[in-house]
């Protein structure tokens, strides 16, 4: 299984990825920022596609070895995400568009609705 967490910069993708990792034994996190730093990639469309290709190849390798893979990566174009996600046996896309991650919150019914 591959979880693909996407969203804007600083939206909590990596935080969520590591929270999931703590709950899923044998899972591996691929952080887009860390991987980008390995190859000193730019941000042109060409560089972004190449970056996603590398992440996808690493994720496929890990998935093939039986790991659950959690990708935390800015992936701005839906077409690109869909193309790369088709290469996995099973995947789930998690979008974080607003830059918010709520933790340890409880839902309370509005007054009069209980």
What are these regions (language model features)?
Residues 8-9, 14:
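The conserved Walker
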Residues 5:
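Hydrophobic anchor at the beta1->P-loop junction of P-loop NTPases
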Residues 44-101:
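Glycine-rich phosphate-binding loop used to anchor ATP phosphates in small-molecule kinases
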Residues 14-65:
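Conserved substrate/cofactor phosphate-moiety recognition/catalytic segment
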Residues 2:
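Walker A (P-loop) ATP-phosphate-binding motif of ABC ATPase nucleotide-binding domains
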Residues 96-114:
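Small-molecule kinase domains that catalyze NTP-dependent phosphoryl transfer to phosphate-bearing small molecules
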Residues 10, 34-37, 76-77:
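Short active-site-proximal "capping" loops at secondary-structure junctions
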